[in-house]
Amino acid sequence: MALYTIGEVALLCDINPVTLRAWQRRYGLLKPQRTDGGHRLFNDADIDRIREIKRWIDNGVQVSKVKMLLSNENVDVQNGWRDQQETLLTYLQSGNLHSLRTWIKERGQDYPAQTLTTHLFIPLRRRLQCQQPTLQALLAILDGVLINYIAICLASARKKQGKDALVVGWNIQDTTRLWLEGWIASQQGWRIDVLAHSLNQLRPELFEGRTLLVWCGENRTSAQQQQLTSWQEQGHDIFPLGI
């Protein structure tokens, strides 16, 4: 029977080891074996279970309810992510930044960056993106807390083995998405730095020797896609980002 370390499982299942530990310790979702030295070992059944957990979470189920679902108990799973958006909005409206940071940090331990970005942060940020001054202020607070949290995550990820990459925005307006995309990439094995401002004209030769991960917004233009392909054919280490 094959056994896998937590690092190997993280790569196989595309999930952060911190999240795997949280699923085990806080929620009792996993029961890995242990070596004599105390290191976790997972078998193929564990990997199947992890993938099933991810499927439930991606469908909007809160982590705290997944264990009952795995036990075939009846659970109300409707509107899970909408509920989490409302919780986050309540923290924003309270003005208590410490509680807001703590809540986001806990979610970051419980869920993969891709899942949180897709189902929580992007939808709520869209709700706040309007001309109403109060909502604009809440969005500014949220973005500041997110960037601060993600910067800490990226700094921690850079201490691990991986390939260095620079996240670059190409002709975009929403620079917070650069940080969210960089966070996702960091959980896929990249050691990420983020170029803080979007570039209207991207010139890969200015970043010679660097791997560039390029965010063009949610819908790349055909011209951008053609140019990215051309740069790759010229030997530039450049790849598009996107959920």
From Swiss-Prot:
Regulation of its function: Activity is regulated by DgcM and PdeR.
Segments of the chain annotated as binding DNA: 6-25
GO molecular function, one term: DNA binding
Keywords carried by this UniProt record: Activator, DNA-binding, Transcription, Transcription regulation
Phenotype upon loss of function: Knockout mutant no longer produces curli, is mannose-resistant haemagglutination (MRHA) negative and produces smooth white colonies on Congo red agar.
Entry-linked SUPFAM superfamilies: Putative DNA-binding domain
Domain HTH merR-type, chain residue ranges per copy: 3-72
Keyword DNA-binding tagged: yes
BP GO terms, sorted: regulation of DNA-templated transcription
Cited Pfam families: MerR_1, MlrA_C, MlrA_helical
Subunit structure: Interacts with DgcM and PdeR.
NCBIfam families for the chain: PRK15043.1
Protein role: Activates transcription of csgD, the master regulator of biofilm formation, by binding to its promoter region. Also controls the transcription of cadC and ibaG. Part of a signaling cascade that regulates curli biosynthesis. The cascade is composed of two c-di-GMP control modules, in which c-di-GMP controlled by the DgcE/PdeH pair (module I) regulates the activity of the DgcM/PdeR pair (module II), which in turn regulates activity of the transcription factor MlrA.
PANTHER family attached to this UniProt entry: HTH-TYPE TRANSCRIPTIONAL REGULATOR MLRA-RELATED, REDOX-CYCLING DRUG-SENSING TRANSCRIPTIONAL ACTIVATOR SOXR
Protein name: HTH-type transcriptional regulator MlrA
Species whose genome carries this gene: Escherichia coli (strain K12)
